[in-house]
């Protein structure tokens, strides 16, 4: 079995990852780590997440950077569910110990150092690792993921958006005259587990944020190969993302071409479901690892709707897909 440690274990995504790793027949959960000053250190994991009582009861351990070499003894896989700056600082330390690193932060998603100063507010100091990192959009990068030692798991909004748009871009069906317009709403869990007034029960209201300056906009544009307009919204529900995307198609594109593009892209991809009728909903994907897609065309105008669970297909489940790809396991292992 492959020994796997999880760093940043106590966030919402960390909890989902701990459960997936524990269920995986080829992985051994060898350690759950938090920052060395975290108040969660020393607690049983299931004391934070009661639904995992009897499933993940390991003690949460503090991680000191100076101790990384010691904790990596015989470790094969490191999963980082840490803040962007933390992943930036420690990923190279784990790579130096001959582990394969799966990073769920944004620290290695775009191979351009300037991107991080502009959108994350820090200078990227690990150009070698940045250039070698593979963007882990599972259905679209399996060959590269299988050879990589640093996999940057995509963001939740980019996963929903790129899954909807990449089949069109691959076949040149998107008009160059108009940017795709993405309006997406996410559950409050996307803001993380730390308490804040903005995500408090009595304060949350469906509203846009990050207009024209959200860091996921350039991430989407970079990996799509088309500029987009992206407006995220905070919804008054726990989990899930619903993205409604308006696309101007290239002149002469037929409904048959659009359908063929999606079918070609996803006919052998078990975690993406093309709906035969109706529209994607958060209810249908909540607490699942699926991405649901549907579309409708009127002339050159196409509306595509994508739904995922932000904590799963938008984070933990996609990380597990990448682990499965990297080590040659079936794509759905531990996920369904």
Swiss-Prot record:
Enzyme Commission number(s): 1.2.1.38
What sort of enzyme, by top EC class, is this? oxidoreductase
Q: Which UniProt keywords apply?
A: Amino-acid biosynthesis, Arginine biosynthesis, Cytoplasm, NADP, Oxidoreductase
Report the InterPro entries cross-referenced here.
Answer: AGPR_AS (IPR023013), AGPR_type-1 (IPR000706), NAD(P)-bd_dom_sf (IPR036291), NAGSA_dehydrogenase (IPR050085), Semialdehyde_DH_NAD-bd (IPR000534)
Localization recorded for this chain is: Cytoplasm
Q: Which GO terms describe its molecular function?
A: N-acetyl-gamma-glutamyl-phosphate reductase activity; NAD binding; NADP+ binding
Pathway connected to this protein? Amino-acid biosynthesis; L-arginine biosynthesis; N(2)-acetyl-L-ornithine from L-glutamate: step 3/4
Q: Check the record and name the NCBIfam families matching this protein.
A: argC
The protein in question is named: N-acetyl-gamma-glutamyl-phosphate reductase
Source species of the chain: Moritella profunda
Q: What phylogenetic lineage does the species belong to? A: Bacteria, Pseudomonadati, Pseudomonadota, Gammaproteobacteria, Alteromonadales
